[in-house]
Amino acid sequence: MTKIMFVCHGNICRSPMAEFIFKDMIKKKGLEGDFVVTSSATSTEEIWNGVGNPVYPPAKEILNLHNIDCNGKRAVQIKKSDYEKYDLLIPMDSNNVRNMSRFL
């Protein structure tokens, strides 16, 4: 089983979109049992009192237009242990790469 985590700054737009689009692609190919896919943030800006904000409404709307459900997703921050837990950590941009290095 391949474990993949997409990472962006706040985990409310880009990385959740990548997570749910990839999950949809896997489902359409019948490969759900071969992958674990999730997403996280490098910051805590979208996490308040331990509770992450949901997917940003315009991002959720785009997913909904493609019949991709992201209900229940809330922002979470990447942890040092994720480097060992996941096979692939996929940052959305070069700033995410830099910020991810703080967790090593």
Q: What spans do the regions from the language model cover?
A:
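Conserved active-site segments centered on acidic
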Residues: 1-85
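Phosphate-binding/catalytic loops
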Residues: 86-88, 94-104
